[in-house]
Amino acid sequence: MEKKGVVIVTGSCGRIGTQIVKRLASSYSIVGFELLKAIYAAEKEELVPVDLSSDESVHQAFSHIKSMYGKKISSVIHLAAYYSFKDQFSPLYDKITVRGTHRLLEQLKNFEVEQFIFTSTMLVHQPQEPGHPITEDSPLRTDWGYPLSKVQTEKLIHEQRGKIPTVILRVAGVYDDVCHSIPISHQIQRIYEKSLESRLFSGNVHHGASFIHMQDLVDALELCVEKRKSLPEESTLLMGEPKTLSYDQMQKSIARLLGQKEFKTFQLPKLLAKLGAWMQGLLPSDTETFIKPWMVDLADDHYELCIDRAKKLLDWSPKCTLEETLPKMVDALLKDPLQWYKKNGLHMPYSLRRKFQK
């Protein structure tokens, strides 16, 4: 089958990158950009080692592209970025996310590029109250490093894209059937282990956040590539499920699936929550605590999305829902707790680990 063109995927060995490479590989010549050359590249993918923080590394990568594939590029799907819950701010956000994107755009000026897709986040928007969905024109926020870096990068793309058509996808939290979502997996873990923290929350329990299933996101990315010639020169699209489950709904659903029928969550004053998070961080442990003091102020945030623009431009809407997928996540946990913890990067307490290793 003749290929439709060349697609570059930065961060191609990540969770999202791996899935979009699989989806597009039969139709396009895929070139993956990764920090280190992985031992195993995806089938039908060429993997090129690229350090986005290095001018020379990015230049060499595109010299290779030009010599091997020519100057025409159908789409660049830019997934690679810095993200960490460890610190509220980090110089790596600017070094990798912002400056890395600048380096890509500088090199792409030497090519004929039909599309540049940047995966941003719904968190660039200020949270709203329930019943007031966020749109692409809603106010922005820059009060911590992750959304700030995305806002800065979106602005940079607008100013430096030249003639390259661009798509900005403001994506909700991504999950799949095994979970692979940091906040959801930790919430499930706390309830599964019946920890004291599972009963406490420092925010409004009636607030929540939008999420999106991995396959729905991959569908959207594929549609962006396929419809690239009919999209506006600049498009910004929110990507997520329009129905947002509150923290309390999540708590009760997870508890019920784990056989804990009566489950009540108590609101903890923010000052106490910050103090508790700070003290936990001081305790000797072989694993780092998830909740950091600075995260307590985000607990009240509510994200409910209007996805009308994505429906109109891409003819896309989510096929999966978090509500329907939670049972699959918990079922995967109950079938093989050790593997579920491992796949989600969680530390299992020794008492539990000993029980399942017998």
Which functions belong to the PLM regions below?
Residues 176, 201-207, 235-245, 255, ...:
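Glycine-rich Rossmann NAD(P)(H)-binding loop
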Residues 223-291, 307, 323, 327-328, ...:
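Mid/C-terminal beta-alpha module of Rossmann-like enzyme folds, strongest
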